Amino acid sequence: MPRLGPGGQPEWRIALVPASQAEVHDTWHTTGLCGTGSNDYSIDGVLVQPGHTFALDELQREGTLYRWPGFFITNSLGIPLGVAADALDTAMGILDRKILMPERTPARDEARVRAAIARAHAMVGSARSYAYDTLGGFWSVLESGDQPSFAARAALAGCYVHTMTTCRDAVQLLVETVGTAAIQRGSSLERNLRDLITMGQHLVAQVKMREWAGGLWFGQPAPLPVI
């Protein structure tokens, strides 16, 4: 029988066991992020000692970094921003050398190309600024010794989705602007887009996260303690 928490729901805990006690299933055959190896696994008949389990809302250490259980998710903000920044550099390099056909004019002189590059830079730059602003404010709250308010948690939850989706859309725009050079296998732009499409399937990039963020803005707790 599962142990029930204060709200009457089964308690959810994370268990740490040696890899040799788990069976890893070769299931990670995906559009992008192929190198992460995020395979499924199963564990059967393994006794886990209580000291090798923990719940995310059990704070184990002192200090700002450990004051709120969901802070570990914030590292996900840097991944789409880094991929999008790489895509911008790559696209700029290609378009600076590309000659458009049949016009035989440099791509960098084309109004459509210039507008797309300006828009992509603004999209990635604004997402980065919003992430830094939101996360910086959140950190200041924790640094002061306080727990984050519903409003602070709402802003951070919404920031996850905004950063992921904005970076993905910016790279999609770059791929469309660069053209066939961006869809060749081995092109870093092609890989950038596939990786961001795959990242977009993570919980922090889903509409559900936006719904939880909206609930937090109205003072309603999210179903996960890390949101």
Language model features with spans:
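Glycine-rich phosphate/cofactor-binding loops in nucleotide/flavin-utilizing enzymes
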Residues: 178-227
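C-terminal helix-coil-helix/basic helical segment that borders enzyme active sites and/or dimer interfaces
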Residues: 126-162, 172-183
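Short beta-alpha junctions and helix-cap segments that line functional grooves
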Residues: 26-29
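An alpha-helix initiation/capping motif
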Residues: 107-114, 118-121, 150-157, 161, ...
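Charged/polar positions within long, soluble alpha-helices
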Residues: 89, 93-96, 129-132, 136, ...
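Glycine-rich beta->alpha junctions and the first turn(s) of the following alpha-helix
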Residues: 31-125
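A short core secondary-structure module
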Residues: 1-24
